[in-house]
């Protein structure tokens, strides 16, 4: 009997899992991501063979950092500088002789939440808040894409903050006061000179205020039924963060319906779960 395989290709770790048709995971393995491209591709092949354990593979899905072209499967993840213009789909299909589907990790994670997170809504916005920040918007089971099939950069909206240290903050993208620069792990370290877990209650109040302002913008523009938060920062802060954001958004969102905010139930497996889903469903 055949199986499906999901790949979560990160800048520091590789996660690979095989699954049944219903998504139940059979085997999973984890390895550090090699810096060298050929070593990385070779290791992925070894991991796929390990989790498949001799069973035919019906499809492979992958989540990887951008930029990339999801239609051609050519990837150039920023956090893996030696992976430049890699024809990942071609390499995988040639080796495994099965359909291969790949997309930006936040899109894949959003699909994982949509199909496997227990949310019964047509429009779901998923945001990951970890070292960086990103998101994916799913409408009726399909990823929303911008002009030219582009990936909307929800974390690079400019946010007005009333706090002196959170004003005129440079972002690596070249702009200032981007949401990512105010609430991501890297942003928090730059602003507060400490990791998120060491913030005081007053400092967390600033972060939550800034995040709520960004979510208010997204609620007004995209009108999602639900916003799901994942990633290391959000998961570590947990329900305390969710309760604070829901309370604040109820006060700030006007004119449009206020979406509920939930914490991801998939934890750190959102992208891997989504990769398994697109190995079965594709992206069309």
Model region roles, listed by residue range:
Residues 73-84:
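A charged helix-plus-loop insertion that forms the helical arch/lid used to bind
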Residues 32-35, 83, 151-153:
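A short acidic/small-residue loop/turn micro-motif
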Residues 28-30, 78, 146:
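Residue-level detector of high-confidence beta-strand sites
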Residues 1-59, 69-72, 90-100, 112-121, ...:
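ATP-binding/phosphotransfer module of carbohydrate and carboxylate kinases, centering on a glycine-rich
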Residues 122-179:
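Glycine-rich phosphate-binding loop of actin/hexokinase-like ATP-binding domains
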Residues 58, 64, 139-140:
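A cytosolic small-molecule/anion-sensing beta-strand core signal
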Residues 102-106:
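Short loop/edge segments at beta-strand edges and connector loops
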Residues 14, 64, 132-133:
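Short loop/turn microsegments at loop-to-beta-strand junctions
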């Amino acid at each position: 009997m055949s199986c499906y395989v999901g790949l979560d290709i990160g800048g520091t770790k590789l996660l690979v899992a095989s699954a049944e048709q219903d998504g139940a995971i059979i085997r999973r393995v984890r390895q550090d991501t090699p810096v060298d491209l050929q070593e990385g591709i070779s290791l992925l092949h070894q991991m796929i063979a390990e989790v498949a354990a001799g069973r035919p593979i019906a499809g492979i899905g992958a989540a990887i950092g951008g930029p990339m072209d999801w239609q051609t499967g050519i990837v150039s993840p920023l956090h893996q500088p030696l992976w430049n213009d890699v024809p990942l789909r071609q390499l995988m299909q040639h080796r495994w002789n099965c359909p291969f589907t790949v997309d930006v990790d936040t899109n894949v994670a959003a699909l994982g939440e949509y199909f496997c997170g227990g949310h019964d809504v047509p429009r779901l916005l998923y945001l990951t808040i970890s070292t960086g920040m990103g998101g994916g918007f799913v409408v009726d089971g399909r990823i929303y894409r911008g002009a030219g099939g582009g990936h909307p950069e929800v974390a690079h909206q400019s946010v007005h903050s009333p706090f002196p240290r959170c004003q005129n903050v440079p972002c690596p993208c070249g702009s200032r006061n981007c949401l990512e620069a105010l609430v991501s792990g890297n942003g928090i370290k730059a602003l507060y000179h400490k990791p998120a877990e060491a913030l005081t209650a007053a400092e967390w109040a600033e972060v939550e205020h800034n995040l709520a302002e960004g979510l208010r913008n997204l609620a007004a523009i995209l009108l999602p039924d639900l916003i799901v938060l994942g990633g290391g920062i959000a998961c570590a802060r947990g329900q305390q963060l969710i309760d604070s954001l829901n309370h604040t958004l109820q006060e700030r969102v006007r004119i449009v319906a206020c979406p509920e905010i939930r914490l991801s139930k998939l934890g750190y497996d959102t992208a891997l779960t989504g990769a398994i889903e697109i190995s079965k469903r594709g992206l069309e």
